[in-house]
């Protein structure tokens, strides 16, 4: 298959549409669950169970894509996502809503497949910039998705879920008709190979892969604490309502798109993946520590931009480095393990952040949010320390010298 830009463009559209559907659900799901008399604890589990399923099934889907090809596994998983969204819209109680979230979490583990596809069709020195396209799709999806969801909720609580199901159907058709397969039969892993973490480490640079994994995990734990509590923080500190918080999340999404979709290639060319990952971890740590000190809109916007830029600087290089730590036909499994670490972090971060916030509930407004956000900053600092233990792969040396934006 010729290595050209069109598959990456189709892949970008695939992830973008997928993330719009996911983003639509974000502002609606808690209110939808309350409609069924869900307690706060039940809502927490309803949110976390999605990531819990991703923890289990992301590496499995990565293995299946290594064995059977990226395109068919991506197609089937997107169809499953459409069914999950439709079931959410049809739900008349919590049992079916939980079942739908479980299905959505299982099929939502497919994010490793686009990353593995990129690893298949790009040279190592251009890989992190291409990974930035995935980050840009995330940013756009999280920018427009919640806004669309908020607007559609005026029709009914179930309308956004039906709309998301329709988007997933369009996405499945797009993958089936347009996206070419990136793996030849010779490149696909043999049936007897297993996707255990130990074997992935054995088929690459195990120690460095573990360090990349740890860095990514702490980044996502800290960042997910922020995303979970941001609306509660701004509501109490500034009196922001859902619409105002939607604008704030939109701003964060725009910054993410600019960084991961436009700047990442040039920055990797100038500084290299390792240096950029370290810079992103430090910037995220500082921004999280400054967030509870926000006392004006200008300061809040500045800190929010720092958080978006920091995670945008760190995440694509970490994905690119992880793919370079293993042999070619193990990249899907390696990236699947990386995304499972992210899913674990997205499960633990909200639970940890919510628990830590209880210590601030009786404090003055000026002190509200310090405990969870400073804890998140500390966790990101641990990740930054991990990042300073990186040793570049020999083949990665060119990332500082070769133009990756071309």
Give the location of each predicted region.
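Juxtamembrane intracellular "pre-TM" segments in multi-pass secondary transporters
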Residues: 1-5, 180-214, 237, 405-406
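Short amphipathic helix-loop junctions that connect adjacent transmembrane helices
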Residues: 27-41, 228-244
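Conserved MFS/SLC helix-loop-helix module at the cytosolic interface between two early adjacent transmembrane helices
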Residues: 55-94
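Helix-to-loop junctions at the C-terminal end of transmembrane segments
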Residues: 58-69, 259-273, 357
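Cytoplasmic helix-loop-helix junction between adjacent transmembrane helices
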Residues: 100-139
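A membrane-interface helix-boundary motif in multi-pass transporters
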Residues: 153-166, 355-379
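Multi-pass alpha-helical transporter architecture, strongest
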Residues: 174-178, 374-406
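C-terminal transmembrane helical hairpin of 12-TM major facilitator-type secondary transporters
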Residues: 274-318
């Amino acid at each position: 298959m010729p290595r050209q830009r069109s598959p990456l463009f189709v892949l970008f559209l695939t992830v973008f549409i997928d993330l719009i559907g996911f983003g639509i659900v974000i502002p609606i799901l808690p209110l939808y669950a309350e409609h069924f008399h869900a307690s706060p604890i039940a809502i927490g589990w309803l949110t976390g169970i999605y990531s819990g399923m991703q923890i289990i099934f992301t590496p499995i889907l990565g293995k299946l894509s290594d064995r059977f090809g990226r395109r068919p596994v991506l197609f089937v998983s997107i169809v499953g996502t459409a069914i999950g969204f439709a079931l959410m819209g049809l739900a008349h109680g919590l049992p079916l809503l939980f079942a739908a979230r479980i299905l959505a979490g299982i099929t939502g583990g497919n994010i490793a497949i686009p990353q593995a596809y990129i690893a298949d069709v790009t040279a190592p020195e251009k890989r992190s910039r291409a990974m930035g396209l995935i980050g840009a799709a995330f940013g756009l999806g999280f920018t427009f998705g919640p806004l669309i969801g908020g607007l559609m909720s005026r029709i009914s609580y179930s309308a956004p879920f039906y709309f998301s199901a329709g988007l997933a159907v369009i996405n499945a058709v797009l993958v089936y008709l347009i996206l070419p397969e990136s793996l030849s039969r010779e490149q696909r892993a043999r049936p007897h190979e297993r996707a255990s973490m130990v074997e992935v480490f054995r088929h690459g640079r195990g120690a460095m892969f573990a360090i990349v994994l740890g860095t990514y995990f702490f980044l996502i734990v800290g960042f997910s604490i922020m995303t979970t509590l941001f609306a509660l923080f701004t509501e109490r500190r500034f009196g922001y309502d859902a619409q105002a918080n939607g604008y704030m999340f939109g701003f964060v999404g725009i910054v993410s798109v600019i960084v991961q979709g436009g700047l990442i290639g040039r920055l990797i060319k100038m500084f290299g993946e390792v240096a950029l990952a370290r810079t992103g971890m430090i910037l995220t740590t500082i921004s999280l520590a400054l967030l509870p000190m926000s006392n004006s809109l200008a300061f809040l916007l500045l800190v929010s931009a720092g958080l978006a830029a920091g995670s945008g600087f760190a995440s694509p290089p970490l994905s690119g480095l992880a793919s370079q730590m293993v042999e070619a036909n193990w990249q899907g499994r390696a990236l699947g393990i990386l995304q499972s670490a992210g899913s674990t972090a997205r499960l633990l971060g909200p639970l940890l952040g919510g628990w830590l916030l209880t210590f601030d509930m009786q404090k003055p407004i000026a002190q509200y949010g310090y405990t969870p956000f400073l804890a998140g900053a500390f966790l990101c600092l641990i990740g930054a320390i991990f990042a300073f233990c990186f040793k570049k792969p020999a083949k990665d040396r060119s990332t500082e010298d070769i133009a990756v934006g071309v």
